[in-house]
Swiss-Prot record:
Extra remark beyond the main annotation: CTPSs have evolved a hybrid strategy for distinguishing between UTP and CTP. The overlapping regions of the product feedback inhibitory and substrate sites recognize a common feature in both compounds, the triphosphate moiety. To differentiate isosteric substrate and product pyrimidine rings, an additional pocket far from the expected kinase/ligase catalytic site, specifically recognizes the cytosine and ribose portions of the product inhibitor.
Organism ancestry: Bacteria, Bacillati, Bacillota, Bacilli, Bacillales
Catalytic activity: UTP + L-glutamine + ATP + H2O = CTP + L-glutamate + ADP + phosphate + 2 H(+); L-glutamine + H2O = L-glutamate + NH4(+); UTP + NH4(+) + ATP = CTP + ADP + phosphate + 2 H(+)
UniProt cross-references to InterPro entries, sorted A to Z: Class_I_gatase-like, CTP_synthase, CTP_synthase_N, GATASE, GATase1_CTP_Synthase, P-loop_NTPase
GO terms classed as biological process: 'de novo' CTP biosynthetic process; CTP biosynthetic process; pyrimidine nucleobase biosynthetic process
Binding sites annotated in the UniProt record for L-glutamine: 54, 355, 383-386, 406, 463
Protein name: CTP synthase
Species of origin: Staphylococcus aureus (strain NCTC 8325 / PS 47)
């Protein structure tokens, strides 16, 4: 039977519940267990797909096309699994589904209430996460902080699930903060005690308490928390601030967290703790020698979480070369043809990531022009690819005013236009081309060198595509279309072979990169940037 672990948080937000959950998932996976993980978000949006990156950070896309919380990126990268649409559940999604059922008459005229209808819907989605993956263990992070009014239906649902499935199949992990009071020179357990008291008042007794702290805890502090929170002493787990997130699984393992969970849930682990690969990764991370400077030219650079997976993928790509990646955050609204060199002259590579909307698009085009004309390694993602074709059309083909129909509906040369199936769609939410699609690679191209194969699969999130009316012109003037959909209709990758490294893709490769397995395009981009740096 599938076992369920619930991770809650108290005292303050941003305690690292997601990292704790994904680190535990990694430990259990390395013990030979089939693990999946999900996030319950208490906000009323159906998904984060239409939310501003300034509000929510990046939108992470799964293989099956779900637009999800950025924490799912942490989960996938840490545990090295591919998640699905059941891995992110929002209050908006739950309420929307219940109200649709009510309108259909599924409740036979009954009064629809938070209990049992909303809580039952939450529990159903919890069970689907396990059923859809045949998981031995489902780890569920509850967003928000214990006591928040928005998360109460989720807390009630996970309380009920213990009665539904049996105590031996359910475990509760609570993350808290142990603040250090500088004036007193000591750490205080009272916030943890009150947080657990709040959780117990809602009917949940934690089995494990993970304590976030700046300093090493004494055994007396652990004993005090165990006494007042009514748990075993060994079930108080210290989680110290770390220089690298990759240290967290090792911290938890050293305190036997995986053993405690396996024993408590009576799991059949196939192996003893195996963290050799993880230790090798951490050794590389802690011994990087030198850095490569990448200019990331974007619209949302004031909130770096908007590009979280891109940043992580760049870091992954630096590890094989033992190089740290220094990201130069460049606000594209400030870049012009005239001042591009001021921002980009000393970078080793230029990356233009995805985005939506007209604002700051001209600055991205100026950055792409600078990369092309000065032979600086360039990598464009999604909108970055679209604007690479726009820049080429304007400055090489001479099509003045060329643009994307998304950004300039009145453009005389719509190099980028709506996907045909999108033309009659008015809603924004959930209507993009989303998820994993195949791409055919053209022989003899940089793309083939990068991937080493003719067919690939990558995740997508876009509504507009390259307009094939301009395909012949671009190819006749030196831009190679190196990747397409299998039917040849949709342009997926472009490159300029006369440059040392100039490649762009319609898909989002950052969603498939792993710390121990960098994505091929990112790795090749960093390799090219390193060569460029060495040849300066």
């Amino acid at each position: 039977m599938t076992k369920f672990i619930f991770v809650t948080g108290g005292v303050v937000s941003s305690l690292g519940k997601g990292i704790t959950a994904s680190s535990l998932g990694r430990l259990l996976k390395d013990r030979g267990l089939n693990v999946t993980i999900q996030k319950f978000d208490p906000y009323l949006n159906v998904d984060p797909g239409t939310m501003s990156p300034y509000q929510h950070g990046e939108v992470f896309v799964t293989d099956d096309g779900a637009e999800t919380d950025l924490d799912l990126g942490h989960y996938e990268r840490f545990i090295d699994i591919n998640l699905n649409k059941f891995s992110n559940v929002t209050a908006g999604k739950v309420y929307s589904h219940v109200l649709k059922k009510e309108r259909r008459g599924d409740y036979l005229g009954g009064t629809v209430q938070v209990i049992p209808h909303i809580t039952n819907e939450i529990k159903e989605r919890l069970l689907l996460a396990g059923e859809s993956t045949n998981a031995d263990v489902v780890i569920t992070e509850i967003g928000g902080t214990t006591g928040d009014i928005e998360s109460l239906p989720f807390i009630e649902a996970i309380r009920q699930i213990r009665s539904d499935l049996g105590r031996e199949n359910v475990m509760y992990v609570h993350c808290t903060l142990l603040p250090y009071i500088k004036a007193a020179g000591e750490m205080k357990t009272k916030p943890t005690q009150h947080s657990v008291k709040e959780l117990r008042g809602l009917g949940i007794q934690p089995d494990l308490i993970v304590v976030r702290t700046e300093y090493e805890m004494t055994q007396d502090l652990k004993d005090k928390i165990a006494l007042f929170c009514d748990i075993n002493k060994e079930s108080v787990i210290e989680c110290r601030d770390a220089d690298s997130l990759y240290e967290i699984p090792l911290q938890l393992s050293q305190q036997n967290m995986d053993d405690i969970v396996i024993k408590r849930l009576q799991l059949n682990a196939k192996y003893e703790t195996q963290l050799d690969e993880w230790k090798q990764l951490l050794d590389i991370v802690n011994n990087l020698d030198g850095k490569i400077t990448i200019g990331l030219v974007g619209k949302y650079v004031s909130l770096q979480d908007a590009y979280l997976s891109v940043v992580e993928s760049l870091k992954h790509a630096g590890y094989p070369f033992a190089k740290d990646i220094d990201i130069r955050w460049i606000d594209s609204s400030e870049v012009t043809d005239e001042n591009a060199a001021e921002y980009l002259a000393d970078v080793d590579g230029i990356l233009v990531p995805g985005g939506f909307g007209f604002r700051a698009s001209e600055g991205k085009i100026s950055a792409i022009k600078y990369a092309r004309e000065n032979n600086v390694p360039f990598f464009g993602i999604c909108l970055g690819m679209q604007l690479a074709t726009v820049e080429f059309s304007r400055n090489v083909l001479g099509l003045e005013g060329a643009h994307s129909a998304e950004l300039d509906p009145a453009t005389p040369y719509p190099i980028i236009d709506l996907l045909p199936e999108q033309k009659d769609i008015e809603d924004l939410g959930g209507t993009l081309r989303l998820g994993l699609y195949s791409c055919s690679i053209k022989e003899g191209t940089l793309a083939q060198d990068v991937y080493g194969k003719a067919e690939i699969e990558e995740r997508h999130r876009h509504r507009y595509e390259f307009n094939n009316d301009y395909r012949e012109q671009l190819e006749a003037n030196g831009m190679v279309i190196s990747g397409t959909s299998p039917d040849g209709r949709l342009v997926e990758m472009v490159e300029i072979p006369t440059n040392d490294f100039f490649i762009a893709c319609q898909f989002h490769p950052e969603f498939l990169s792993r710390p121990n397995r960098p994505h091929p395009i990112f790795k090749s981009f960093i390799e090219a940037s390193l060569k460029y740096q060495q040849n300066k």
